[in-house]
Structures are given as structure tokens and as C-alpha cells.
Regions:
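A short alpha-helical cap/connector motif
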Residues: 1-117, 121-182
């Protein structure tokens, strides 16, 4: 998936994309159902392309859908994406791709996942809970990716777990990929 393909997919949802006024590498999105509402996704186009490649050929769980930008990127090459976010706006305004299903809570989702992307609440306790839930659903060779590692509670929560391997992409944005310790 190229950045242009991601932009085209997002535009296909009816969402308007504009450069974010305070960060040229970021985007601001406008809901087609609520033109007065401006939302910002911190998932950059470059991160979206990387997420798309990372998810390729896997069953994916996304914890924290937000505006659905990362969901679109994950779904582009994933076998199937299950996404968790209680956002009413997401449920009412976002038309998910055919290989995406949205759930109310992690406990409702059946099966295991080869890739889990966590970008939910950003306080320490919530991130730890998301990690614990993810580890219960992760396949033996699975990987977990985190967004917003620049936030101190997110970094502290990720650091509090024992990972087999960890790869950070500070030049790509705020993504960190972790593999479960064997």
C-alpha cells in the first residue's frame, strides 16, 4: 500500500483529509456526517503504509479505532481486522471495509491474532489492561504494535512488560513493534 492508496481508501469512506495546521506530517479529518466536527488522527500516512505491510496476510485485532484511519491501513492487506472502540461516531459514521468487524469489548472477540495494534486510551492502567488482553489473544508467533510511544504512560506501560524483541521506528512516527517473550 502506498501513501496515495491509503489516501484514496480514506477518501472512499467519504472523509475529507486536510493537512493538520500544527503538524505538516499529520492530517486532519472531517466526518461526512458532521461537517462541523474536526478530528485529528495521529496516524500519519507513512505509519499507515507501514501498518498495512505489517498486517499483510494476518488476522488482526485493533484496540482503539478512533477515526478509522489505521483500520483502513490495516485492512488493506490483512486477512481480517477485528476492531474495538466504543466510539459512537465510528459506529455511525464510518463504513468499514468488508474484511473488518467492530466489537464492543475485547472479551467478545473469538480466536487468536497474528497482529495486534494498540492505540486505545493512553493512561498507564488502560495501556496495561490492553496489553494483558492482547497477550491472551496473540498467536504464539504474533506481534503487538503500539502507537503514541511519546506519551509517558504509554511508554511506561510497554516498558513494564517483558518482550522477546522490540523494534522502534522513531523516524517513521510513533510506532513500536514488540514480539512476545518465548
Amino acid at each position: 500500500m502506498t501513501a496515495q492508496q491509503l489516501v484514496d481508501a480514506i477518501l472512499g469512506l467519504g472523509v475529507t483529509i486536510q493537512p493538520h495546521p500544527s503538524n505538516e506530517q499529520d492530517c486532519q479529518y472531517q466526518s461526512p456526517d458532521d461537517p462541523g466536527r474536526q478530528d485529528r488522527s495521529s496516524v500519519t500516512l507513512q505509519e499507515g503504509v507501514l501498518l498495512s505491510e505489517w498486517a499483510s496476510g494476518h488476522r488482526v485485532m485493533e484496540i482503539g479505532t478512533g477515526l478509522g484511519v489505521s483500520t483502513v491501513a490495516l485492512a488493506h492487506h490483512a486477512d481480517f481486522v477485528h476492531t474495538i472502540d466504543p466510539s459512537e461516531w465510528v459506529r455511525s459514521a464510518l463504513t468499514m471495509p468488508q474484511n473488518v468487524r467492530q466489537w464492543a469489548s475485547v472479551e467478545d472477540v473469538p480466536g487468536t491474532f497474528g497482529r495486534i495494534f494498540i492505540d486505545g486510551l493512553h493512561d498507564f492502567a488502560s495501556v496495561c489492561k490492553d496489553i494483558e488482553s492482547a497477550l491472551l489473544m496473540l498467536s504464539p508467533e504474533g506481534q503487538v504494535a503500539f502507537h503514541d510511544m511519546c506519551q509517558s504512560d504509554v511508554r511506561a506501560a510497554v516498558d513494564s512488560f517483558d518482550w522477546k524483541d522490540r523494534i522502534e521506528y522513531p523516524t517513521v512516527g510513533l510506532l513500536t513493534f514488540c514480539m512476545v517473550k518465548a
